[in-house]
């Protein structure tokens, strides 16, 4: 800037009379060192605010020209978090990779995570990198989940956490959760009732694909709260729900598909050639149509209420998240140029992210319990002792959020399951400015991968880290460790400003469902052991579906 000012003044100098020009030139020659000094000082201050050191990030070996480390992650059978874990064993808890033009910082210790998400770094690491999937299926920068950190995102976050997912609002929607969980358990009992023998008094174990049932349950619970979908709805409504569910399932599959353009934008033609771009565009259109129809139905419902001059829902109508969002939008509190897109993006984010995360945690938790029958027996003893035999006599025991604090072993089981098998093994962010992490300089635009899976198995932090041991969370050492982002050694829901806003909701559903399963069913693995292999992909899915032998429990 100082150079440009001097250059501009020289042009002015040649336009002035000689005497005046001489005075101006003398003045500039005197002033220019001062200008240059302050410009350099300002740059230095900016540099000092963001980067105390200039030590570059250590880079893993094996990078190729142009594509960088891409080939290390091209084996479709390898799990990225495991590959990165092996690299951390070699390079330490902080190192970098290159993918095309993108530099990626990889951290795998709680100390490094704390550096990234405390102080000024927390704000700098509050962006998520965009991707082909986000651009084509999730409204790009207007998506709640992927919008850049700034006023727009903060307003959406405020709406989500304070007006949709606050404790007060969750209490208001409590009857919807319980209703859908009840409906799902009734379906499960119906499956088992078909296997009665001996004059309809003796149950024979029924083989049930539990990961499918978990998906059914979580979609119904979240769909009911977000958009009013009911699992026992009439045929027309059920058809809409099925379209919704199919679109969400397609999103999950496409999100797990590698897009070349996310790494090397100039090679975007490969994604078009393979058909990935077209599939994502079509899926995005389906999602927008389904969510748009739901929003329009809710708008018509509000107009009907307005025309009737009642100002309130009838006894047959329920308020859900979309209703709340539309009310906020009417008060002009939804930010951005397209408030309706904001409403749709919030609904879509909750339906897609919430359903997958909760289903996966349930699936891994039950898998672990079936492979450790001694721990399942301890959980059963706690549940039976707390609720008593009386509530097992019918198939609709009252399990409420208020019961959770008393079920300490159930809480420990779910924590330990999320420690070993987090729903998302990698947490991804991007820095908006230069910063320092671990004594290294991190340039602006660097992507961040937090290897949650590796960090939560750190032997420095966890004794016998590969062992499923819920008792560790009952000890004085780990008893106070929480999963809501404040204890950096255990962050299954993330941490920092972009921590999952639905963590409390997910935990309530997890405790409710696991407790009822243990209360109402005897559960066994059909072939002795459950296969615990994980499938590569965006979410931490199992390779083999979870088939379980279920027998309803009865009084002795």
UniProtKB/Swiss-Prot annotation:
Cofactor needs: heme
CDD domains: CYP82
Transmembrane segments: 18-38
Catalytic activity entry: (S)-cis-N-methylcanadine + reduced [NADPH--hemoprotein reductase] + O2 = (S)-1-hydroxy-N-methylcanadine + oxidized [NADPH--hemoprotein reductase] + H2O + H(+)
Annotated EC: 1.14.14.166
GO MF annotation: an example: oxidoreductase activity, acting on paired donors, with incorporation or reduction of molecular oxygen
Lineage: superkingdom: Eukaryota
InterPro entries: Cyt_P450, Cyt_P450_CS, Cyt_P450_E_grp-I, Cyt_P450_sf, Plant_Cytochrome_P450_Monoox
Mode of membrane association: Single-pass membrane protein
Tissue: Highly expressed in capsules. Expressed is stems.
Protein task: Cytochrome P450 involved in the biosynthesis of the benzylisoquinoline alkaloid noscapine. Converts (S)-N-methylcanadine to (S)-1-hydroxy-N-methylcanadine.
Name this polypeptide is given: (S)-N-methylcanadine 1-hydroxylase CYP82Y1
Organism in which the protein naturally occurs: Papaver somniferum
């Amino acid at each position: 800037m100082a150079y440009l000012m001097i250059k501009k003044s020289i042009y002015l100098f040649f336009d002035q009379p000689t005497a005046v020009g001489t005075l101006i030139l003398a003045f500039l020659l005197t002033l220019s060192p001062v200008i240059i000094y302050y410009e350099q000082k300002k740059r230095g201050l900016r540099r000092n605010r963001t980067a105390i050191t200039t030590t570059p990030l250590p880079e893993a070996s094996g990078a190729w020209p142009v594509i960088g480390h891409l080939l290390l992650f091209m084996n479709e059978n390898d799990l990225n978090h495991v590959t990165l874990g092996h690299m951390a064993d070699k390079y330490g808890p902080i190192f970098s990779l290159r993918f095309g033009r993108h530099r990626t910082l990889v951290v795998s210790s709680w100390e490094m995570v704390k550096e990234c998400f405390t102080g000024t770094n927390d704000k700098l690491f509050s962006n998520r990198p965009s991707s082909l999937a986000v651009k084509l299926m999730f409204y790009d920068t207007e998506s709640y989940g992927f919008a850049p950190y700034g006023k727009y995102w903060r307003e959406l976050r405020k709406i989500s956490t304070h007006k949709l997912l606050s404790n007060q609002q969750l209490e208001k929607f409590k009857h919807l959760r319980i209703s859908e969980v009840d409906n799902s358990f009734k379906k499960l009992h119906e499956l088992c009732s078909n296997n009665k023998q001996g004059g309809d008094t003796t149950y024979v174990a029924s083989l049930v694909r539990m990961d499918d049932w978990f998906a059914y349950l979580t979609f119904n619970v979240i769909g009911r709260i977000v958009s009013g979908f009911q699992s026992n709805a009439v045929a027309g409504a059920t058809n809409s729900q099925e379209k919704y569910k199919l679109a969400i399932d397609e999103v999950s599959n496409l999100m797990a598909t590698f897009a070349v353009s996310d790494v090397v934008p100039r090679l975007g033609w490969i994604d078009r050639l393979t058909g990935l771009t077209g599939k994502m565009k079509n899926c995005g259109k389906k999602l927008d149509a389904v969510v748009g129809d739901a929003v329009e139905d809710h708008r018509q419902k509000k107009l009907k209420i307005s025309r009737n001059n009642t100002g309130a829902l009838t006894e047959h109508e329920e308020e859900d998240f979309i209703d709340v969002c539309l009310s906020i939008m009417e008060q002009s509190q939804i930010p951005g140029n397209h408030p309706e897109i904001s409403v749709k993006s919030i609904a879509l984010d909750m339906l897609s992210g919430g359903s997958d995360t909760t289903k996966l945690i349930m699936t891994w938790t039950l898998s672990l319990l079936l492979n450790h029958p001694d721990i399942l027996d301890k959980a059963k003893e706690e549940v039976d002792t707390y609720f008593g035999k009386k509530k097992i006599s019918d198939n609709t025991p009252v399990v409420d959020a208020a019961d959770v604090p008393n079920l300490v072993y159930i809480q420990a089981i779910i924590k330990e399951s999320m420690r070993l098998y987090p729903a998302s093994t990698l947490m991804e962010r991007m820095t908006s400015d230069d910063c320092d992490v671990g004594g290294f300089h991190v340039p602006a635009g660097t992507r961040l991968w937090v290897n949650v899976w590796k960090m939560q198995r750190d032997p420095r932090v966890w004794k016998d880290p590969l062992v499923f041991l819920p008792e560790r969370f009952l000890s004085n050492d780990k008893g106070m460790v929480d999963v809501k982002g404040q204890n950096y050694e255990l962050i299954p829901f993330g941490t920092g400003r972009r921590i999952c806003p639905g963590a409390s909701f997910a935990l309530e559903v997890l405790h409710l469902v696991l407790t009822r399963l243990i209360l109402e069913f005897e559960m066994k693995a059909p072939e002795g052991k459950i296969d615990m292999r994980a499938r590569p992909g965006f979410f931490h899915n199992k390779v083999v579906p979870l088939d379980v032998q279920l027998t309803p429990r009865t009084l002795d």
